[in-house]
């Protein structure tokens, strides 16, 4: 699978608050299941503070369509997702 950094932009402050409420009520196991399929899997997510309506996720997927399919149930919260494909060449500045 390919690596993608995906930018998710909430439709409103209310949509962001609702998403935080929904995810806060789920177990990590349930969230992982919801973000995993044979063709797409969320690796990590970064939320932004305050009124910033953007969040970022690192996905592994066969293509953006597979990731969009995995995210279908959350489309009420977000504007269309933006994808940047990344290589497997990672520079880990924390590695020793």
Give residue spans per PLM region.
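N-terminus-centered regions that define maturation/targeting leaders and the start
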Residues: 27-28, 75-79
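A short beta-strand motif that forms part of the nucleic acid-binding face
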Residues: 61, 74
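Conserved short beta-strand edge segments in small beta-sheet-based binding/regulatory domains
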Residues: 77-90
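A short, polar/proline- and glycine-enriched secondary-structure boundary/capping micro-motif
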Residues: 17, 68, 79-82
């Amino acid at each position: 699978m390919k690596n993608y950094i995906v930018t998710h932009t909430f439709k409103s402050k209310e949509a962001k608050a609702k998403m935080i409420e929904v995810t806060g009520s789920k177990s990590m196991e349930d969230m992982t299941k919801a973000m995993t399929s044979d063709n797409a899997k969320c690796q990590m997510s970064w939320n932004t503070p305050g009124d910033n309506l953007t969040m970022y996720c690192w996905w592994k997927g066969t293509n953006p369509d597979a990731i969009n399919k995995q995210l279908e149930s959350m489309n009420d919260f977000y504007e269309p997702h933006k994808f940047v494909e990344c290589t497997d060449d990672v520079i880990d500045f924390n590695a020793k």
